[in-house]
């Protein structure tokens, strides 16, 4: 359990998420993320030189990604701060926040910034020399697509793990479609009153199109509404499977930033000094081969145990749900109402840019609890390699 790590209320942002090959498809994720963070600091009147350490969460290689931590720190104005690159697939956000929290807990630094930035669009195509190959043919990898399609240990694609979990927990096509419609309904809640909820945390992203033209993206792009009839008409992705392209997420682009600091500094930086946000605990798990979604529940239970909490103590639950079966399986194991989780949106609906996904979900959970007057937030999500991570925050 952590006791010394705090997040200032509104000391965070998420850009809109754009479906891949959209408006952010050609932007360098680290450069765009750092520049967006710098604009956010300016909007808050924060001095980036006060940041002592930068944690960059990113999973898709970009040019000179090797320098991500210190490079991003310098670009955002924190020129005296070192930085580290964290890549833990889709649980990168949870690990980044936890690592920042551990830095506070151990007294290594007093003020940190977590930048989560990724671009699934136009992923890199890597090649390695192979002199012993036929005619010297290189070893090649499409960074994004090849890793969607094959876990080198479990031996299957991501969608296969979802079907394995669905079969293990006796989940049906009808349940997956029904939950997708519920998640769509919850996302629509965030769009009411001219996106009133999203405007609590969403920060526009600006793209330099030319010397004279700047494109501003203010809202999510590429979210397709679902209907019962539309979902029912879709074929399963795998023969006899329960998931269609409607009941799984899609790759996206975007970035998020979160301040993790001391209680005193969090109060100074907070939009409401009376609304305290504490990083409380962390959990992790690994499921058996090819059962990625099954790791979510035990990781959540570990975070609860570390915090000394029960499910009934939670005020909000947010999950990274790349497949509808994720939430259904988690609900079965932990005795949850799947329909009550993920108010105001989730990655099943607004897309998955990988590293930033969890951060946006955490931010949305904070804002939901702020509206309710406070409570405990659980974020849980699966990650490549049949793993999962969870984090608990106390709001108020």
Go through the PLM ranges and name each one:
Residues 7-13, 203-206, 276-285:
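Short amphipathic
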Residues 25-98, 103-132, 200-217, 311-334:
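Conserved beta-ketoacyl condensing-enzyme motif
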Residues 47-50, 173-177, 189-204, 272-277, ...:
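Flexible, glycine/charged-enriched surface loops at secondary-structure junctions
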Residues 162-172, 301-309:
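Short, well-ordered beta-strand elements within core beta-sheets of diverse protein domains
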